[in-house]
Amino acid sequence: MSGSPKFVSPFHRPHCLSAAAPAGQAKLTHPGKAILAGGIAGGIEICITFPTEYVKTQLQLDEKANPPRYKGIVDCVKQTVQGHGVKGLYRGLSSLLYGSIPKAAVRFGVFEFLSNQMRDESGKLDSTRGLICGLGAGVAEAVVVVCPMETVKVKFIHDQTSANPKYRGFFHGVREIVRTQGLKGTYQGLTATVLKQGSNQAIRFYVMTALRNWYKGDNPNKSINPVVTGLFGAVAGAASVFGNTPLDVIKTRMQGLEAHKYKSTVDCAIKIMKYEGPAAFYKGTVPRLGRVCMDVAIVFIIYEEVVKVLNKVWKTD
């Protein structure tokens, strides 16, 4: 009948953020879900992996000129447990926990927001665009959360291992840093942090996107087992470690209590090379490798599973 209204498929929306996409079109994740799922994943992950983060930071701060206090990873753990008990490996956890939740929330929220704009009409995101979205997510988390929180964390851990600690707790430490150094005291090493986080997430999301696309093949909505997601995450984490550990070392030095020794990020890199040699740029790689692989695997597994639950209870049509 000529007067009948023309039927328009409710699925004819290439970029709709729905829980049920048409066959052959990838489901997109609403940024709001990504923020919530990312925050949950970040909080759980850091509680599990913090001891390796503590050891990594201690080894990086243990400069050769001191002379070195620790002989290696095992010695660092041994001395810490002997002096402070097992709980000593969790000193500084509060500062990192307060930052981990919003960091992961910003990272995944920004990544999903950017990727939803850059996917093709079938909803697929190629690995190159995944790298760009990851870079954007990394820069955002660096500026909004990571730099101020990491600066406080490094100063707090460094202070707690000194002969006469002056910070009574996380919030007291923050107040003292702001009181004596101003807000800029929480933004030391911003350039190094942006470079580190940007390259970190660019590498991780590039690898994850490439592996996911390979695994799913021609079916963009093919379900991925959590174990597989974890393996992909571990590979992505390892790639990021070897790709930017030097930046991580520079960032840690720039945010430590002796950051005043360096005029800039470049000056820090030059002095490390001049006085400690190229090997110093990879100091703490082993503990960082273990932590990051576990970190990324856990975060992606929890994130993906939480998103699945949210898709059932939070409709975003």
From Swiss-Prot:
It is found in: Mitochondrion inner membrane. It catalyses: (S)-malate(in) + citrate(out) = (S)-malate(out) + citrate(in); D-threo-isocitrate(in) + citrate(out) = D-threo-isocitrate(out) + citrate(in); citrate(out) + succinate(in) = citrate(in) + succinate(out); cis-aconitate(in) + citrate(out) = cis-aconitate(out) + citrate(in). GO terms for cellular component: mitochondrial inner membrane; mitochondrion. Residues 1-20 form a propeptide. PROSITE patterns: SOLCAR. The keyword Transit peptide applies. GO terms for biological process: mitochondrial citrate transmembrane transport; neuromuscular junction development. One of its GO terms (molecular function) is citrate secondary active transmembrane transporter activity. It is a multi-pass membrane protein. InterPro entries: Mit_carrier, Mitochondrial_sb/sol_carrier, Mt_carrier_dom_sf, TXTP-like. The keyword Amino-acid biosynthesis does not apply. The chain crosses the membrane at residues 35-55, 130-150, 223-243, 294-314. Possesses a short cleavable presequence, which, however, is found to be dispensable both for targeting to mitochondria and insertion into the inner membrane. However, the presequence is required to keep SLC25A1 in a soluble state and thus in an import-competent state. Mature SLC25A1 lacking the presequence is prone to aggregation. Disruption phenotype: Morpholino-injected embryos display altered tail morphology, impaired swimming and defective touch-evoked escape responses. Neuromuscular junction development is abnormal and motor axon terminals show short and erratic outgrowth toward the muscle fiber with no evidence of complete synapse formation. In addition, knockdown embryos often show edema of the hindbrain, heart, yolk sac and tail. Its main location: mitochondrion. Keywords: Antiport, Membrane, Mitochondrion, Mitochondrion inner membrane, Repeat, Transit peptide, Transmembrane, Transmembrane helix, Transport. Mitochondrial electroneutral antiporter that exports citrate from the mitochondria into the cytosol in exchange for malate. Also able to mediate the exchange of citrate for isocitrate, phosphoenolpyruvate, cis-aconitate and to a lesser extent trans-aconitate, maleate and succinate. In the cytoplasm, citrate plays important roles in fatty acid and sterol synthesis, regulation of glycolysis, protein acetylation, and other physiopathological processes. Belongs to the mitochondrial carrier (TC 2.A.29) family. This is Tricarboxylate transport protein B, mitochondrial. The lineage of its organism: Eukaryota, Metazoa, Chordata, Craniata, Vertebrata.
